[in-house]
Amino acid sequence: MQMDNNRLDINEMMTGREYLDSLNDGRSVYIYGQKIKDVSRHPAFRNSAHSISRLYEALHHPESQDLMTSVDRDGYRTHRYFMPSPSGNELLKARDAIASWSRLTYGFMGRTPDYKAGFTATLGSDPHLYAPFHENALHWYRQTARKVLFLNHVLVNPPVGRSRAIADMRDIYLHTEKETDAGITVRGVKMVATSAVISNATFVAQNSATQYQIGREEDFALCFILPMNAPNLKIMCRRSYEASALSPFDNPLSSRFDENDSVLIFDGVFVPWENVLIYRDIERARNFYSASGFLNRYPLQSGTRLAVKMDFICGLLIKVLESNGTDSFRSVRTRLADIVALRNLMWSLTESLCLNPSDCTHLEDSAVSC
């Protein structure tokens, strides 16, 4: 712990090694019909896991720490996008922190930890949206910010019985099975959980297009956060592009940046009350996306990542044109200029998102967090 002008500066952010160790927590991961014991060493996941570990290492590097991190209102150092931004200029700094992380994967990993930070930071700025579970929201904001936890999300019901009511799909769709003083037990299937196998926890909710029947489908109106090693939670992975890649030289992207997608099976999973954000509340479950601020924040992360990817593509294209001697052709330069213009457009859009934010002055901690 350090003191900066009498202000706390507590650093509990995971290192790369701590992140890799956190994946070997007893979680139930299955791929090709086999249960995986060591995620960080398995050939289907190890390179992508180590790509993420580089992001965590960068948070502690002296040359990049001040660019990527800051101290939140509680005195804990965290990634700038994991905390609410009190001004447009601070949000622009968060954009630059996103870009710095994204450059480590050339913009090709879309669901890095800062993606879900677009949501978790709002838990700190507007916890009362989740009343009577507002203390849970604050708890999870603090947990994710202090450790810079890697969350995935799982929102979609399996694509079966689409013509039937949600209540008639109880044997498949995720729902509350039992309630006790300690928490709830849930059962069912959710998809598609991108990078679930290499993340720390999953955020579970319903897709924004879900239509509930009031008085009949309250058991399905849920929103909670769950560690990936929760008992009876099974992670069923698609085939691994990383495992089938010959080498980083032959397959430079799929060999290192494969964000494996999973189906999550909740086979009687216990969820403590402190992990619950919405429970049997159709109105809140229905309005969560528009009310929480996540829809406002996540485009900044995804747009910044695309801008970084465009940097890479433009640079690669210029090298190709130089190598084959066509870089001086006027028609080729015109086409190249079109692509560079798209690159410039993306950077301009992300800057505009930061400096012309939505008015969120009703929130207790941030004028622009939503």
Where are the regions a protein language model picked out?
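N-terminal-proximal low-complexity accessory segments that begin disordered
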Residues: 4-58
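Short, charged, low-complexity loops and linkers
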Residues: 5, 29, 292-301, 326-333
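Acidic, low-complexity proline/glycine-rich segments
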Residues: 14-26, 277-288, 304-316
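Generic structural signal for well-ordered, non-transmembrane alpha-helical segments
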Residues: 46, 50, 142-145, 308-311, ...
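Internal helix-loop-helix
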Residues: 57-151
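FAD-binding core of flavoproteins
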Residues: 153-302
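Extended amphipathic alpha-helical segments enriched in small hydrophobics
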Residues: 301-360
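Long, low-complexity C-terminal extensions of enzymes
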Residues: 363-370
